[in-house]
């Protein structure tokens, strides 16, 4: 009986602590994001150190946009190509999904958490992708802020 009570309490605590993502939170995703780690369904983690590429998201007020891989350069700019994934944001049953499409594939990921500095997605294989907000690099000595 005691174990059942503890289990129910922990379950309640877990459910009540999940972030409720609102439509206005989606605007926070616009910009550059650097992957920090991936958490696999068995709890194993893969940490990422320095990343050669960032994910750039641009979502409009109609919840449509794109995700593109960009490579930060030492002067604060980004190298880009023409490849991108179209994105549609979908709200369903108090959950938020990002539906991706390319000419070759379609898939969805659930948005688990978002803030001004952190972003977490979960894919169909139950892998969680943890991102941190990224800034352009600038190691030049001119003291100027990059755009």
What are these regions (language model features)?
Residues 1-8, 19:
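Positively charged n-region of N-terminal signal peptides that target proteins for export
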Residues 13-16:
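C-terminal motif of bacterial Sec signal peptides marking the signal peptidase cleavage site
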Residues 19-34:
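N-terminal helix-cap/turn-to-beta initiation motif at the start of protein domains
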Residues 29, 57-65, 91-95, 112-119, ...:
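Short, solvent-exposed coil/turn segments at beta-strand boundaries
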Residues 46-87:
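N-terminal glycine/threonine-rich, aromatic-flanked beta-hairpin/loop signature
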Residues 79-112:
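An anionic, turn-rich surface loop/hairpin at beta-sheet edges
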Residues 108-129:
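Short, compact, well-ordered microdomains
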Residues 122-147:
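Edge beta-strand at a domain terminus
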């Amino acid at each position: 009986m005691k174990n059942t009570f503890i289990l129910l309490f922990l379950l309640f605590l877990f459910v009540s602590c999940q972030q409720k993502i609102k439509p206005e939170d989606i605007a926070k995703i616009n910009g550059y994001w650097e992957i920090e780690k991936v958490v696999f369904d068995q709890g194993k983690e893969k940490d990422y150190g320095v990343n050669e590429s960032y994910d750039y998201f641009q979502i409009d007020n109609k919840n449509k946009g794109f995700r593109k891989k960009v490579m930060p350069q030492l002067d604060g700019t980004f190298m880009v190509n023409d490849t991108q994934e179209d994105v549609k944001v979908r709200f369903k049953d108090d959950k938020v999904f990002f539906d991706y499409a390319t000419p070759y594939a379609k898939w969805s990921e659930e948005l688990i958490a978002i803030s001004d500095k952190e972003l977490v997605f979960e894919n169909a294989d139950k892998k969680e992708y943890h991102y941190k907000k990224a800034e352009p690099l600038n190691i030049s000595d001119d003291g100027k802020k990059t755009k």
